[in-house]
Amino acid sequence: MRRPPTRSKSRCRLLVHGVVAALLLAACTSGPDRDRDEEAVPDDLSPAPAPGERWQPAPGGSWQWQLTGKLDTSVKAAVYDIDGFTTTKEQVAELKAAGRRTICYLSTGAWEDFRPDAGAFPPSMRGEGNGWEGERWLDIRRLAELEPLIAERFDMCRNKGFDAVEPDNMDAYRNKSGFPLTAGDQLNYNRLIVRLAHDRGLSVGLKNDLDQIPELVGDFDFAVNEQCAQYDECGRLTPFIAAGKAVFHVEYELPASRFCPASRELKLSSLEKKYDLGAWRKAC
């Protein structure tokens, strides 16, 4: 992922500590864009999977991505991508009762000191900071140690009733992680993430990592991308669309009018969002 100032983190720092949480909540009071959200929800849902099968999101459906502030369950979107730790089982059930699909957001490539399981990741596994306070890249070569830690997180997603997972920080090899990571290391780790999700009946999305799409499009069930329009990269996501797999896309610095025509042509599920990833959205 690109680093500030050219690009923000894959999500706004999840400021959920004490007073900061209250300030963030106040900052997110502007509701979602209602001009684009008056349509009925379930008509763009992918068909329900048969028992024992995973949900497969199809291209072009509507979605909402909210990681901060009080969860707004009234947004008229077919898919909700929300924080796996802070979202409750009851909130997931409410969304699913209303016909929505739910994606469990987690960081799988970086350590976060504010997560309840932070102490389970040994210090030697934590590398350089990834540009955000309290976060460090993980040594993704240590598959045997990481597997049970990530498996426990995915168990949490499954037990809360999520349909899918969005694993973040999936391109450590392209960053100054503090470890001599290779593209092969990243492929091995990303495929471990896929296996752990699929073993639990969860769909899984490839987050950014554009260079490895040709190798990974067959493994992942959908893609999540930030700012491909700003950096003229959206065409690189078309293998997912060609495979009948959704691409959930967000822009922060471009108005929707700048990227929506191309997004519709490419069948991307695109949003304009603010960097805090609160409830506000403008859908294409």
Q: What do these predicted regions represent?
A:
Residues 18, 37-284:
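Glycan-processing catalytic domains of CAZymes
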